[in-house]
């Protein structure tokens, strides 16, 4: 899973930067190796327009104190010597936004580590327990009812349910401006080390990294249609493979091990919806699209502060649901070259 904080708005950049800093110390805090490798992140530019966008993002990042800069092809080649830089390619690489603190982390290790830490601190985890309803009394959320009929009371209910965010929020009487799409990815067989930086291309709609086990992890953009059906498509495999081979032709004979599709909840301007709602005792962490994993630590910390104090932390104030009614949007549309 890719981790970075090179976003295009000051609100977003500062928020994700706080999360990245928490990730840097999370292995030690949890006593669990999360396999976090800050190997760097390259967002490729293939046109003059793309170079302008990269320069703009680099300036926003600089204002937020984030290490992010535009680099030329010779430095790109030094960072990714195995990548094809042929000038007569369909999409020639003319520059890139280089973000040194970015990198990859094992998502399953993060989940296991956080679950173990939560359990050690007295939290109860109920896997495979579907929520069927949110209980309310006098306009306040008071708990949840599970599909098997069990009721769980709570002083505060938080929905952090990704693709099902709008469905869960409706149970509490809250409408969210969210659509649900699928995001696909696949991995190859393990290969010798070829790439130690994350490579992303917006025009090719592909992102590529190599795991510590040698597998190449390859993904693309969210699919344009709305669905809850988590089924991959042949077109994704064909197009992603084609563009990957334009950058790394040496992968021509690599075998695909597995592919998958997950659900993403997308807000109108690709920024999250965070914090309290008009229903007392019901808060949300929604609208993450493809960015949510990067923000997990800081979301947990800020929502815990909101629940404990009743006040919204300044870091998440810009992402309140009410911004859509006040025309105070925080547009991160295009902040990811592709969905990662």
Each PLM stretch: what is its role?
Residues 4-82, 205, 235, 243-245:
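Dinucleotide-binding Rossmann-like beta1-alpha1 core, especially the glycine-rich loop
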Residues 14-17, 44-53, 97-116, 126, ...:
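Short beta-strand to alpha-helix junction loop
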Residues 26-35, 60, 64-68, 122-124, ...:
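Surface-exposed helix-capping loop/turn segments at secondary-structure junctions
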Residues 31-40, 133-135, 140-141, 151-280, ...:
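Active-site substrate-recognition segment that forms the wall
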Residues 38, 72-73, 127-129, 258:
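Short loop/edge segments at beta-strand edges and connector loops
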Residues 96-156:
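Helical element adjacent to the flavin cofactor pocket in flavoenzyme catalytic cores
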Residues 245-340:
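C-terminal catalytic lobe of FAD-dependent flavoproteins
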